[in-house]
Amino acid sequence: MKSDAFRHAAESKDFSKVGELFSEDVVFRSPAVFQPYTGLDSLKVLLGTVAEVFEDFRYVDQVETGDSAVLVFEARIGERELHGVDVLRFGEDGLIAEMMVMIRPLSGLNALVEEMGRRLAAASG
């Protein structure tokens, strides 16, 4: 499946080869903000930070058709359990051109937003 390399990177928390998986102008749609992030540099920071925040991350289902894939995951942030989906769209070059993440329940999303905000603020000085 096209999404296997991404799945392996996410499950192993190894995003060192993000540039080999995503297009340079990838569009990332976060569950926390409406405006998408654009570009590989932003994506590297976000994926690296979320990999630090999520505990017990695992994919529990995967569906692919044509140029799209949906990966269903479960994770934990502290005592908050959450479920989510990564929706990937592949470009003609086979690289991921767009990624959209959705998370439930709201308490899990709120925990993610809070912890991501804290870590990103600390990283930017």
Residue ranges and their predicted role:
Residues M1-G125:
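C-terminal and inter-domain tail/linker signature
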